[in-house]
Each structure stands twice: as structure tokens, then as C-alpha cells.
């Protein structure tokens, strides 16, 4: 009882004597104000050099470019190809008369892949204690977590 009281009082004494070391140390405490001002000036200069998106290409210039190119672009042609549903060749049935991802083909492919995953032999057993090599060593020596599986 006496030694634990001395230990606790000593720890409390250290906690009150060393407040800077027991508190949180913020990252910005190690950066000087001069460095922060230099960084702020650098950011301001970069912002001045980089034009805003609205200022970079005025809307009048865009409309003039569209008129020069012919008919104005439709909203669908502005979308990237990966955003669309399917491309026109797939929508019309492709070259061979049917799309490459017809629903029955796709479901059959997914079923076969799932079946292959479920029936595939497990090359590595699950072990919560050791890796594969340690399991083999443990099995031969009687040590390890999975040694009960290898009894002969």
C-alpha cells in the first residue's frame, strides 16, 4: 500500500512538473511565423498566375467555336463514353447480330466464375497463429495452433 502511494504521488508530481511534454504537440508549433508568411505569399502568387475557370474561356468564345464547327454539340456528345449506357454498335446488336454482354451470356459467365471460386481448392489454410511455413513446422513438431489437424 505504501509503495503504490509513493508511485502514484511521484507520477502526479511528474505530470504537473512537465506539462509541455505531457500535452499534445501541434504540428504548426514547429513552423515559424516567417515560414508561414512565405508560404502564404507563395500561394498568393500562384493564385495570381492561375486564371479562374470563368476568366480562362469566356462563354462568347465557346459559342463562336461551336458555330464554326457546325451544329452545336448535343448534351449526349459531351458525356464521356464510360458515362453512357452502351455504345451504338452494342445497342444495334454489334457486328455479329448480338451484343457481347447479352444478359443470358453475362449471367452464365458470372455463375461459372462464382462456381469456380467456390469449388477452387484452398492453397493456404487459414491460421490465426502462424504463416504457412510455421504451420508445417508446428505440424511436425507438435507445436503451433493447427497441430491437431495433422495427427496420424
Swiss-Prot record:
GO molecular function: hormone activity; hormone receptor binding; neuropeptide hormone activity; neuropeptide receptor binding
GO annotation (BP), single: vasodilation
Domain of life according to the entry: Eukaryota
Keywords on record: Cell projection, Disulfide bond, Hormone, Phosphoprotein, Secreted, Signal, Vasoactive, Vasodilator
Post-translational modification: The precursor molecule is proteolytically cleaved by CORIN at Arg-122 to produce the atrial natriuretic peptide. Undergoes further proteolytic cleavage by unknown proteases to give rise to long-acting natriuretic peptide, vessel dilator and kaliuretic peptide. Additional processing gives rise to the auriculin and atriopeptin peptides. In the kidneys, alternative processing by an unknown protease results in the peptide urodilatin.
Keyword Phosphoprotein: yes
Residue(s) at site: Cleavage: 122-123, 129-130
Signal peptide segment: 1-24
Positions of the UniProt region annotated as Important for degradation of atrial natriuretic peptide by IDE: 146-150
Modified residues (Phosphoserine): 128
Propeptide segments, given as residue ranges: 25-122, 92-102
Entry-linked Pfam families: ANP
Acetylation among keywords: no
Disulfide bonds: 129-145
Similarity-based family: Belongs to the natriuretic peptide family.
The protein's name in its UniProt record: Natriuretic peptides A
